[in-house]
Amino acid sequence: MSHANEVPTWSGNREVGALSAGEGFLTVLASWARAFPGAPGHVSEARRFVAHLLVGSPFRDDAIVVLSELFTNAVLHTDSGKTGGLVTVQVTRWRQGVRIAVTDQGSLSQPVIRDPGASGEPPDCGRGLYLAAQLAGHLAWHDDPSGRTIAAAFGKVAPEHTHLRSCGISNPVGGVR
């Protein structure tokens, strides 16, 4: 039986230690990563994965919503949604926050955050990143040869830990203007 204040254990990639940035250190309680097939039916499995890891976290509900949006975008808009595609989810916890990162297999298009209230925007798309930007304290992404990673940080992240706030990624977004 799991207690609400315990950090769940998982047999995947777990790292415990400190991340350094400049002069400061941030103690990471745990970090997990898991790859899922890039198909719509696996979004719920990814949500359960994150929900289990964030039991007792005040960021759990928002993190699950953001994960769902990012995973769905990866399946619908990137090569991860093609036959045999994968989506990797990474969850990192520290005492005052959580980071959710979703890595897909890339695409030629770039992520766009659309304000659903703006006139002229398609009514049925573009809301996922807007919602993620509203719920997360920080949202950022980058591309590399393996694909695209979009990461959302929740909670308190000290200014000297920009690698967690912007998740070491270009295009940081702290909300939509």
Regions found by a protein language model. Give the residues of each.
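Conserved beta-strand-loop-beta-strand hairpin that lines the nucleotide-binding pocket
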Residues: M1-A33, V75-R177
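STAS-typified acidic loop motif
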Residues: A33-V43
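Conserved short strand/loop->alpha-helix "switch" segment adjacent to the catalytic nucleotide/phosphoryl-transfer site
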Residues: E45-S68, E121
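Conserved ATP-binding N-box helix of the HATPase_c
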Residues: P58-G85
